[in-house]
Swiss-Prot record:
It comes from Schizosaccharomyces pombe (strain 972 / ATCC 24843). Probable zinc transporter involved in Golgi membrane trafficking through the regulation of zinc homeostasis. It is a multi-pass membrane protein. This is Probable zinc transporter cis4. Coiled coil: none annotated.
Amino acid sequence: MNVNSSAFERTNRFPSFPVLKDDQKTSSDSIAAAKKKDLLSLISSKSLLSSETLGWFSVICAFSITGSGLEVNTMSIPFYLIFGIFAFVSFTTQYLGIYSFSFQPFQLLNVIIASLSMVFITLGAFVLGTLDTTCLLLLAFKLFFIRNDPTPFNARSANLKNYIAFPICLFVINHILILLGYFQCSYSVFYASVFYILLGVFIRVFYLVNKEKFEKKELAFLFSSIVVACLIQFNVLPLGTINLSVTRFTILCFMQIFCINWDGIARIQFYLGKFDISLIMALISAIINKTASQNSIKIISCLYQVGFCFFKIGSSITANLKLPDNSRIYRLYNDFIVNGVLADKESRSIFYFFLLNVSYMFVQVIYGLWTNSLGLISDAIHMAFDCIAILVGLVATTLAKMPLNYAYPFGFAKIEALSGFTNGIFLVLISFSIVGEALYRLFHPPQMNTDQLLLVSFLGLVVNLVGILAFNHGHNHDHGSHHHHSHSNHSMCLPNTTNDINIFEEFEEEKDNVEAQKMGYTNDDHVSQHEHTHENSQEHHHEHNHNHDHIHKYNEKCDHESISLQNLDNDHHCHHHHENHNMHGIFLHIIADTMGSVGVIVSTILIQWFSWTGFDPLASLIIAALIFVSVLPLIKDSAKNLLSVTDPESEYLLKQCLSNISLSNSVISLSNPKFWTNERGEVYGILHIQVSIDGDLNVVRNEVFRKLSIAVPNLKHICIQSERPNNCWCGK
């Protein structure tokens, strides 16, 4: 009784920790899993990273960044340069199908339309504030979509009053500020900005409607817009050149990628109360943004305007964020990050280094904006390209691990070679650009400020050294050549099977099992025999026999004959060039950055000692030469891999072996020999043989397989199809 009472007291004292039985634990685990699934679905369905919401938010941020005073040093950007950059962005995004849902077909006319629209709105947003630009956008959209209404203002007065009243208030405020001299802008520039924004919106929405009905109007309106663009370019109209910082203009260009998709703007319902405190604060922020002299106050007012536009004006979008494409974001994150990058130790280390690189890049950007240092911002932009290269390598690593399928029976391993080749070409272009800039600076030495170079270069060197350590001391297990010699009286087994080959074997066996379940007995009407011989660490071959004179049960166990190569004598030399071109390319990027940091440190010290700025271009020339020399082997090897080239040694052995096989009495001819070497030095091949009537198909095929296995020790996979004369499906 005492034991039971004490147990009762314990269970009452700690009621939240009951002792569960096995079935209760299983039920509890299932409930926890269900709750976790519901939470993940909630996160994925309520994600802010949907195409519509992200596009709307990017539009607002683009306007804010355009008109904010984040940097003092600016550069003059002409109209043609703005149009050229936006044309490139529009062409790339529409050609690749990125955030271009409003343009169904890819046409050059659509690229021009999107480019003109983005240029006009950028010019207008450069002068006006975030609220002004956003409200004019919404007003233009609404006026366009009710243009065919017989009584638009009577029928839709309740909806239009906010769209019209708020821009009128901002218009009056801007006029008063210009009159008082607080808003440093002329009336002509102000009116031109309003006109540009309206024109950009009308160009954009004209091509959202039925093209058959408004085809002539579209062409006429487009021609008028091109005329306006030409007048701006030749400074007949204002804002032919705008003064923007490099950072703001670069961020603006990236923002415009998401700004292409504006379908959600047409569905925004703008409801504001007469005495809404947020409305009053928005008008005050517009006044502060025009009159404040300190950048910090302007930034605070811009942030409030972004929040007001996104959550108040765009409330009809933010109130319903459950869009169908949100689940794909979580699925992409789970497949790429969790099951792809983080599942492998090597790629996980590179991913952590990528996060460190991105973090350091943002630190450089923030500190560069804070101190107005062009050197820090330039180095951050350079590091951004390195982050892109590392990200491409990580994507290639994940895609290369995708399972085989019927469409890609040899897998996706060549993606790594393609990534390595791309990174190699990119490094060659970088080395050429460094040489050109260094030669110019060598003969035209600029004035250099070396106060912050040592600190920035030292921090960059530390980050790159961490990246080298992430590769396990230079990625020594993947780079370099590994030589294996096999002579007589030595074991002659093939290398261990890689994951790709295991997957392929399982893929073939699974296909056979599916066919076995579908078919019980077969009775073929023709004489044909098709064998596939697969060689892996277990050295087995797989046969499929179809003969008209017997019945073969598919549910019987298939015959797997093991061919042991342990006691075979061979005096050939086997060479394996074991290299991952993708990781090699990433590693060379880190090495190039490391050499750059070291070069900057050494040149900075020499400049401070001898006061000659020529040490900087000399160090750049040495670094460019080292990058060029180190990247050539990567380009050469990855190009051979992409072209499916057989290495010279294996090619010589294959020619000798195939020549000996062709002399056999049972072999009439050999056709379609295709052999190639992958990046691990393993040989793959396909071969058709025609066997005489006197020869046995199985015996001849096994003999061919045995001879090839002995002659080419690094033969990994060979598919041999043995046929009777004049009975091959390929016509040989």
